[in-house]
């Protein structure tokens, strides 16, 4: 009886710790795993060629921002997608060269699978070439979003 109670307490403690750890990561941006870019230059722009995992305007169904693009994967039953959309729209509107694109994860399963989107909202911050700079899953915090966007707009300086 006492052994069973101890086992139950251990399981509850482990589950609580796991839940706390997941909650702390939710909505926080993390750097994307970079895929080495081809060393060649993009013919038309003279800039480095985009990485192989970069997203194009054709992938998104909308033009990329001149400096950055905020991409939100949403679903109809997502409780946090509306507030996240409002925040991303505001940040894109207030910063020159930043675009916002919302993608219905259920309608674009090709991208959902390719980018390993497991929950909504998932937010990607893309650079000017469509390379994924960072991503977050869950409700996004304004400060974290501004830091992630700042890292793309001014990669060498403070944001």
Where would I find each of the regions flagged by the language model?
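N-terminal targeting signals for export/organelle localization
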Residues: 1-51
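Anionic-ligand binding region
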Residues: 49-51, 55-61, 66
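Short active-site neighborhood of thiol/selenol oxidoreductases, capturing the structured segment around
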Residues: 64-76
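The canonical Cys-X-X-Cys-His
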Residues: 78-81, 123
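Typically the conserved alpha-helix immediately C-terminal to a functionally engaged Cys/Sec
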Residues: 82-94
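Thiol-based oxidoreductase modules, predominantly thioredoxin-like and allied folds used
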Residues: 96-110
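Structural micro-motif
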Residues: 116-124
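Non-catalytic, surface beta->alpha helical segment in thiol-disulfide oxidoreductase systems
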Residues: 125-159
């Amino acid at each position: 009886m006492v052994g069973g109670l101890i086992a139950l307490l251990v399981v509850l403690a482990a589950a609580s710790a796991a839940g706390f750890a997941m909650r702390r990561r939710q909505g926080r941006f993390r750097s994307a795993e970079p895929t080495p870019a081809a060393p060649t230059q993009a013919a038309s722009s003279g800039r480095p060629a985009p990485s192989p995992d970069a997203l194009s305007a054709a992938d998104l169904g909308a033009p990329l921002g001149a400096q950055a693009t905020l991409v939100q994967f949403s679903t109809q039953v997502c409780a946090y997608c509306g507030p996240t959309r409002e925040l991303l729209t505001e940040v894109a509107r207030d910063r020159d060269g930043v675009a916002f694109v919302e993608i219905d994860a259920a309608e674009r399963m090709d991208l959902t699978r390719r980018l390993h989107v497991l929950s909504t909202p998932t937010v990607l911050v893309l650079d000017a070439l469509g390379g994924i700079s960072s991503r977050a899953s869950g409700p996004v915090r304004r400060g974290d979003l501004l830091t992630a966007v700042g890292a793309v707009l001014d990669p060498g300086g403070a944001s």
